[in-house]
Amino acid sequence: MMKRKTWLTIGIAALLLFCTAVLAEGANRNVPLDSALDAALNAPGSGIAFANGSAHPWQVVEIDGRTAAKSGNAGAANSSSAVSAQVTIAEGQSLSFDWNVDGEPTTGALAMWDYLVFIVDGEYIDYIHSVEENTPLGWETFTWTPDEAGTYAMEWAYNKDASNNSGADCGYLDNVAVIGEPAQTAAPTAEPQPGEEFTIFEEDFSP
């Protein structure tokens, strides 16, 4: 009986040591924090919630005196690294963000090699790419105004072709925000409709 208790105690101790080792290993992994990514991507005062891609997740980075986010598929041929958000824009408002890219230069109007693209509801809106080898394009501010108010599925993706890696090989994104004041809607006024009757009461106030 004593021998059984001893082996049981040893087994429990070994299990606890194993669990502790697994937890420690997990804590040391570089797991991106959504709150940190949101803070890096949003402009001051903006509260957009972003979803990070699982294959090549975006990362928080300090660059050019700002805290921003960069794509995570550097050196991965035929890959895409995307970050997305559901954004509601009212009438009179627009979406604004800063973006930059440092990758393989693209030449020609129709060539799309390594580039950072902005997509809304599955439609390519605009994209940027490097124009010189090992030289970032530089930060640019882009503003998009929808045709009508609504909630839109937005995505920023750094897409790579099958060959050539240049520079930092990534796209950068920062200062995402909905800007502008919502349009004011005039309050409806009641107007007499045809066929309605109105009664006027007269009262004699003379002494």
What are these regions (language model features)?
Residues 109-122:
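Short, surface-exposed beta-strand/strand-loop-strand elements in extracellular ectodomains
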Residues 24, 183-195:
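Ser/Thr-rich, Proline-interspersed low-complexity disordered segments
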Residues 28-68, 206-207:
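Extracellular glycan-recognition surfaces and repeat-rich motifs
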Residues 123-149:
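Extracellular carbohydrate recognition and processing domains
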